[in-house]
């Protein structure tokens, strides 16, 4: 049986400060939730080994700070990402409105090879709270308008849909990683113009 190389998937979680990015990450990786809120300074990551379609992969999940003043630190963290998770708080409409700018920010900073088809996943978090302000249909419509991004409604506190969401994140990230590998293995052939072809023919002539 041939051993397959270990796959490391880099996942970036973006969204405004306080939407629950760190809580979602901790719930998924450590099965823990804390009511004590502490803003993430800069960026931090956790890793978790998961099975994706009978393949063992390591997910490296990056939690990037939501405050504007830390965004300049994030450029290096965006690079090499295999999937981007956009998180908003269903009780705070402003955090939903900024999803557009977070998505654009990622595409600019990460510069993925195929931005049109890069895998995003949207999470509407804190559905355990009663004062909901962003309707499911509104979030679904936004996600659909952005190349049909998968959308999940989650609660980091109650562990609702967290596992399911990250399974989709892992699967889409693995697909992205595989496509990049194939692209690197079979790069586009070089195109020669007429002068180059004539020069090549002359150089290979043994007369």
Curated annotation (Swiss-Prot):
<feature type="binding site">
    <location>
        <position position="35"/>
    </location>
    <ligand>
        <name>GTP</name>
    </ligand>
</feature>
<dbReference type="GO" id="GO:0061724">
    <property type="term" value="P:lipophagy"/>
</dbReference>
<dbReference type="InterPro" id="IPR027417">
    <property type="entry name" value="P-loop_NTPase"/>
</dbReference>
<feature type="short sequence motif" description="Switch 1">
    <location>
        <begin position="28"/>
        <end position="41"/>
    </location>
</feature>
<feature type="binding site">
    <location>
        <position position="157"/>
    </location>
    <ligand>
        <name>GTP</name>
    </ligand>
</feature>
<keyword id="KW-0449">Lipoprotein</keyword>
<feature type="binding site">
    <location>
        <position position="22"/>
    </location>
    <ligand>
        <name>GTP</name>
    </ligand>
</feature>
<keyword id="KW-0342">GTP-binding</keyword>
<keyword id="KW-0967">Endosome</keyword>
<dbReference type="GO" id="GO:0030670">
    <property type="term" value="C:phagocytic vesicle membrane"/>
</dbReference>
<feature type="binding site">
    <location>
        <position position="37"/>
    </location>
    <ligand>
        <name>GTP</name>
    </ligand>
</feature>
<feature type="lipid moiety-binding region" description="S-geranylgeranyl cysteine">
    <location>
        <position position="205"/>
    </location>
</feature>
<comment type="similarity">
    <text>Belongs to the small GTPase superfamily. Rab family.</text>
</comment>
<keyword id="KW-0458">Lysosome</keyword>
<dbReference type="GO" id="GO:0099638">
    <property type="term" value="P:endosome to plasma membrane protein transport"/>
</dbReference>
<feature type="cross-link" description="Glycyl lysine isopeptide (Lys-Gly) (interchain with G-Cter in ubiquitin)">
    <location>
        <position position="191"/>
    </location>
</feature>
<feature type="binding site">
    <location>
        <position position="21"/>
    </location>
    <ligand>
        <name>GTP</name>
    </ligand>
</feature>
<keyword id="KW-0496">Mitochondrion</keyword>
<dbReference type="GO" id="GO:0003925">
    <property type="term" value="F:G protein activity"/>
</dbReference>
<feature type="binding site">
    <location>
        <position position="18"/>
    </location>
    <ligand>
        <name>GTP</name>
    </ligand>
</feature>
<feature type="lipid moiety-binding region" description="S-geranylgeranyl cysteine">
    <location>
        <position position="207"/>
    </location>
</feature>
<dbReference type="Pfam" id="PF00071">
    <property type="entry name" value="Ras"/>
</dbReference>
<feature type="binding site">
    <location>
        <position position="156"/>
    </location>
    <ligand>
        <name>GTP</name>
    </ligand>
</feature>
<keyword id="KW-0007">Acetylation</keyword>
<feature type="cross-link" description="Glycyl lysine isopeptide (Lys-Gly) (interchain with G-Cter in ubiquitin)">
    <location>
        <position position="194"/>
    </location>
</feature>
<feature type="binding site">
    <location>
        <position position="125"/>
    </location>
    <ligand>
        <name>GTP</name>
    </ligand>
</feature>
<keyword id="KW-0597">Phosphoprotein</keyword>
<dbReference type="GO" id="GO:0090385">
    <property type="term" value="P:phagosome-lysosome fusion"/>
</dbReference>
<keyword id="KW-0636">Prenylation</keyword>
<keyword id="KW-1017">Isopeptide bond</keyword>
<dbReference type="GO" id="GO:0090383">
    <property type="term" value="P:phagosome acidification"/>
</dbReference>
<feature type="modified residue" description="Cysteine methyl ester">
    <location>
        <position position="207"/>
    </location>
</feature>
<dbReference type="GO" id="GO:0005770">
    <property type="term" value="C:late endosome"/>
</dbReference>
<feature type="binding site">
    <location>
        <position position="63"/>
    </location>
    <ligand>
        <name>Mg(2+)</name>
    </ligand>
</feature>
<dbReference type="GO" id="GO:0000421">
    <property type="term" value="C:autophagosome membrane"/>
</dbReference>
<keyword id="KW-0488">Methylation</keyword>
<feature type="binding site">
    <location>
        <position position="66"/>
    </location>
    <ligand>
        <name>GTP</name>
    </ligand>
</feature>
<dbReference type="GO" id="GO:0005739">
    <property type="term" value="C:mitochondrion"/>
</dbReference>
<keyword id="KW-0813">Transport</keyword>
<keyword id="KW-0378">Hydrolase</keyword>
<dbReference type="GO" id="GO:0031966">
    <property type="term" value="C:mitochondrial membrane"/>
</dbReference>
<dbReference type="GO" id="GO:0031902">
    <property type="term" value="C:late endosome membrane"/>
</dbReference>
């Amino acid at each position: 049986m041939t051993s397959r190389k270990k796959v490391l998937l880099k996942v970036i979680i973006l969204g405004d400060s306080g939407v629950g990015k760190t809580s979602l990450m901790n719930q998924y990786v450590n099965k823990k939730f804390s009511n004590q809120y502490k803003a993430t300074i800069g960026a931090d990551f956790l890793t978790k080994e998961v099975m994706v379609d009978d393949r063992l992969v390591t997910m490296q999940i990056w939690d990037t700070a939501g405050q504007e003043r830390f965004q300049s630190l994030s450029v290096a963290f965006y690079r090499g990402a295999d999937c981007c998770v956009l998180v908003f708080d269903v009780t705070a409409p402003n955090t939903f409105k900024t999803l557009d700018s977070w998505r654009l920010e990622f595409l600019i900073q990460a510069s993925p090879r195929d931005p049109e088809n890069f895998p995003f996943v949207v999470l509407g978090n804190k559905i355990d709270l009663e004062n909901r302000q962003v309707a499911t249909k509104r979030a679904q419509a936004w996600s659909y308008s952005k190349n049909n991004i998968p959308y999940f409604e989650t609660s980091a506190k109650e562990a609702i849909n967290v596992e399911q969401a990250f399974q989709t994140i892992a699967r889409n990230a693995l697909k992205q990683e595989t496509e990049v590998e194939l692209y690197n293995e079979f790069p586009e052939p070089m195109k020669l113009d007429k002068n180059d072809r004539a020069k090549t023919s002359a150089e290979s002539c043994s007369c």
